[in-house]
Design a protein with these regions (language model features):
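Catalytic nucleophile loop of clan PA
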Residues: 369-389
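A short, Trp-centered hydrophobic/proline-enriched beta-strand micro-motif
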Residues: 233-249, 332
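Feature responds to low-complexity, polar/acidic, surface-exposed segments characteristic
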Residues: 18-53, 66-136, 144-171, 185-198, ...
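Sec-dependent N-terminal signal peptides of Gram-positive bacterial secreted proteins and lipoproteins
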Residues: 3-24
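C-terminal cap/linker of serine protease catalytic domains
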Residues: 218-234, 242, 276, 280, ...
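Short beta->alpha transition motifs characteristic of CBS
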Residues: 261, 269-274, 346, 352, ...
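Conserved active-site neighborhood of the chymotrypsin/trypsin-like protease fold
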Residues: 248-254, 261-336, 340-343, 358-361, ...
Length: 457
């Protein structure tokens, strides 16, 4: 199949399904004009007793969508990225011109892509338009296609209140705006989004109609806590075990780490790699991969960002929270591989939100950790990362420290990883005691050769 590619921002979104019995058709807001043009039996695969029937009818009457030919709509088929661009472009055109006339082309979506690029609905780059769109991609395009005033706030959704969306994400502003406007409200009872999930043509119709018809927007309140079992189910496969080896391929230690991008960028402690010549990660499904290089190593914050030799590009990821919001007494969880017991979950509280040790500040916590837990995520009550477990005081009980995750945003991260063998000298000193003291200027050392784009810019 012919491939046309473009990179767009990834945004997390999901649709609340409203039964058709509760559906209320009405004229649209602002410049959206509702013109009854949908006839009985317009689409042979859309029955009036199906939850999405009213949404499909309204979306058609607003001029947002058309069928797929031969009297079909294919409501359950996954929306492709090309189709998502078409919908967002048509919505914008209808809003500003009361029409959506685009020339025919092959592939059909190319005139819409040109329009979307012109009006900043999508960004430049490579992307497979024939691949399924994620809820994230679709939501971001919907928000970027219209003026902010269309999305009037009806819900109080504070920053970091959505369990798996951070305001710091590229798509964060779009998602929080759509939550607050009641366009999207999550795909489970906890309001989580699942950023890489796909979206059906029926679900996309529902979202678009909520934009045009405020009567269908969703009022909701997000929970302050999510049960531990639900957090574990959502994130367990984003956490893995690390094993490091010396030059003779003898095991040195085991530790923990977690994915921060779906393409396999991962985060752990820097000290995990002390004296290491190579390292592997083992996922919960048993798959083992080599660590091939590092996007960042920062001794000052004790963080290392690395990639593995996997071609898979849809890893589950953890959401980075705001460690400044962690308060003494808050419920927290640690998820890692203590004593090689993979993905062991423990719970406790923040014992001190700002514990000073040797001139640096850490989160002190009481969730039990052991050897092998280093580098594992410290999670808040929503399952967001607020720290990276660092050390435990052996002379006490559950006296543990974690590096606050907000330090991550001060780390310069290269898009292209520097090969493991090229940075081995950083690990040979052990615990950051090399010639560069407590901070190594990784970006200046390797940036000219390997930097393409910093994920923290």
């Amino acid at each position: 199949m012919k491939k046309i590619k473009l990179i767009i921002l990834f945004v997390l979104a999901a649709c609340i399904l409203v039964p058709s019995a509760a559906f209320a058709e009405s004229p649209g807001i602002g410049n959206f004009e509702y013109v009854p043009r949908y006839t009985a039996g317009q689409f042979r695969d859309v029955r009036e007793d199906q939850w999405f029937a009213g949404y499909v009818r309204s979306a058609y009457n607003f001029g947002f969508l058309r069928g797929t030919g031969a009297g079909l709509f294919e409501p359950e088929r996954l929306l492709t990225l090309g189709e998502a661009v078409v919908l967002a472009a048509r919505m914008r055109s209808v809003f500003f011109t009361q029409g959506a006339e685009f020339p025919t082309a092959d592939p059909f979506f190319m005139p819409y892509v040109d329009y979307a690029l012109r009006y900043n609905i999508i960004g430049n780059g490579e992307r497979d338009f024939f691949a399924p769109a994620t809820r994230a991609q679709f939501a971001d395009m919907i928000y970027r296609s219209l003026p902010p005033g269309v999305f009037a706030q009806i819900n109080n959704v504070p920053d970091f209140a959505i369990a798996d969306v951070s305001p710091r994400d590229n798509f964060g502003n779009s998602i929080y705006a759509l939550y607050r406007a009641g366009i999207f409200a999550g795909s489970d009872r906890f309001g989580t989004f699942f950023p890489n999930s796909t979206i059906s043509r029926a679900e996309s119709s529902a979202a678009m109609v909520r934009v045009a018809n405020p009567a269908l927007r969703v009022s909701m309140t997000l929970p302050a806590e999510i049960p531990a079992e639900a957090i574990f189910r959502r994130i367990t496969d984003a956490v893995f075990m690390i094993e490091t080896f010396d030059e003779r391929e003898r095991s040195i230690r085991t530790a923990s780490g977690f994915f921060i991008t779906s393409t396999g960028k991962a985060l752990t402690n820097f000290h995990v790699f002390d004296f290491a010549a190579s390292a592997t990660v083992t996922l919960t499904n048993g798959n083992k991969y080599n660590i091939i290089g590092f996007h960042a190593v920062c001794l000052e914050s004790n963080m290392a960002v690395f990639s593995i030799d996997a071609e898979y590009d849809n890893f589950n990821t953890l959401t980075l929270g705001n460690s400044d919001l962690a308060e003494t007494g808050n419920l927290i969880y640690a998820l890692g591989s203590p004593m090689q017991l993979m993905n062991s979950l423990s719970s406790g509280v923040v014992s001190s939100s700002s514990r000073e040790v040797d001139g640096k500040y850490y989160i002190q916590f009481s969730a039990p950790i052991s050897f092998g837990s280093g580098g594992s995520p410290l999670l808040n009550a929503l399952g967001q990362v607020v720290g990276i477990t660092y050390l435990s005081f052996t002379g006490g009980q559950n006296l543990n420290l974690a590096v606050p995750i907000n330090r991550f945003w001060d780390v310069d991260i290269l898009d292209i990883p520097v090969p493991f063998e090229q940075v081995r000298s950083l690990f040979e000193a052990g615990d950051g005691d090399g010639e560069n003291g407590d901070y190594y200027d990784y970006e200046n050392e390797y940036g000219d050769e390997y930097e393409d784009e910093s994920v923290n810019d």
